[in-house]
């Protein structure tokens, strides 16, 4: 469903294989360059009994939500890269997949090419997860890294990110933290078997970061990074927040360059494990979509959790020192 940047990457991967076949591509316009049937009629796809899996790479809320629900109700597995829908409708979509005995997998929604959710799922098979944390947005990491290493102002670093294709023409959802918050919500829901409401997550983006803040961090032997964090509380609630943080220079997170991500799991017994790689892009994201399809083909059709429960976000117990910039005369 969709054959743009990510969908085109999935198409190329499938064309190189002999064990998978694309039955249809859903597109609003003719695509004569594609070696498969192209249709603008979704009902043709969902009613075809030979189609076992719908791959949703359209993005956005509608019609992606309508199509995903229809596919699940028709008994078809769904693989999606749609972090917006999976953060907003997680509980509803997982429940719908369970009721229809099909798989719903969304590894590509978090971490791009990193097998983050799959590794999180594997950890949960062994032991409880206590915390998830890390750098979940490549655009903001590129901007902060460029400001740190090249001394550029925020606006210049943003323009450079846009020129390289790391930032959208309208980068608002990256800069205000919405993109990383969605990834954090999905990770939190999977890690703790819960449903967190996205608006409850405390969120601060990087739009207010200035070169003087980067310099102040350097004087303290620290590096500014946009960090996501969620931990399970004894009450069953979840502490969940996204904010710029000054990371000590010796930490792995401080050294993450350019548009890369680094996301970590803290398990009850194994401690902290980190996963590093490209956080976005045509082939990294398509790779995770393909891995989900292979998992389904190989019988790994269960959902990330089958015991969802509502969870309240409670950050009242989180005590941390903060850096505050004050404009004024030195006294």
Task: For each feature predicted by the language model, list its residue ranges.
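A conserved regulatory-domain signal marking ACT and ACT-like small-molecule sensing domains
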Residues: 293-331
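Rossmann-fold NAD(P)-binding glycine/threonine-rich loop
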Residues: 64-70, 74, 81-122
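Rossmann-fold NAD(P) dinucleotide-binding segment
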Residues: 40-81
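Rossmann-like NAD(P)H-binding beta-loop-alpha module
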Residues: 51, 98-179, 186
């Amino acid at each position: 469903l969709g054959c743009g940047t990510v969908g085109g990457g999935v198409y190329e991967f499938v064309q190189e294989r002999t064990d998978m076949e694309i039955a249809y591509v859903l597109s609003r316009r003719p695509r004569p360059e594609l070696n498969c049937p192209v249709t603008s009629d979704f009902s043709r796809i969902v009613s075809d009994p030979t189609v076992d899996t719908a791959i949703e790479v359209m993005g956005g809320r509608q019609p992606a939500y309508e199509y995903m629900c229809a596919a699940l109700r028709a008994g078809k597995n769904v693989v999606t890269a749609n972090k917006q829908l999976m953060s907003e409708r997680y509980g509803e979509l997982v429940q719908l997949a369970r009721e229809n005995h099909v798989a719903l997998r969304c590894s590509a929604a978090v971490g791009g090419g990193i097998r983050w959710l799959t590794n999180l799922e594997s950890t949960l098979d062994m032991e409880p997860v206590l915390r998830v944390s890390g750098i979940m947005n490549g655009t903001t990491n590129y901007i902060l890294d460029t400001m740190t290493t090249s001394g550029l102002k925020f606006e210049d670093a943003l323009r450079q990110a846009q020129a390289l294709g790391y930032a959208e023409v309208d980068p608002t959802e990256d800069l205000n933290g919405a993109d990383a918050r969605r990834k954090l919500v999905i990770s939190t829901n999977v890690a703790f078997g819960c449903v967190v409401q996205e608006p409850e997550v405390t969120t601060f983006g990087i739009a207010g970061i200035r070169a003087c803040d980067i310099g102040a961090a350097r004087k303290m032997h620290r590096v500014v990074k946009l960090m996501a964090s969620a931990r399970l509380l004894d009450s069953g609630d979840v502490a969940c927040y996204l904010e710029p943080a000054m990371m000590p220079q010796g930490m792995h997170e401080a050294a993450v360059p350019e548009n890369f991500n680094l996301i970590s799991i803290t398990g009850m017994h194994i401690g902290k494990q980190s996963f590093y790689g490209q956080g976005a892009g045509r082939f990294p994201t398509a790779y995770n979509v393909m891995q989900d399809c292979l998992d389904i083909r190989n019988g790994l059709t269960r959902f990330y959790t089958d015991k969802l429960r509502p969870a309240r976000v409670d950050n009242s117990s989180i005590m941390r020192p903060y850096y505050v910039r004050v404009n004024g005369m030195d006294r």
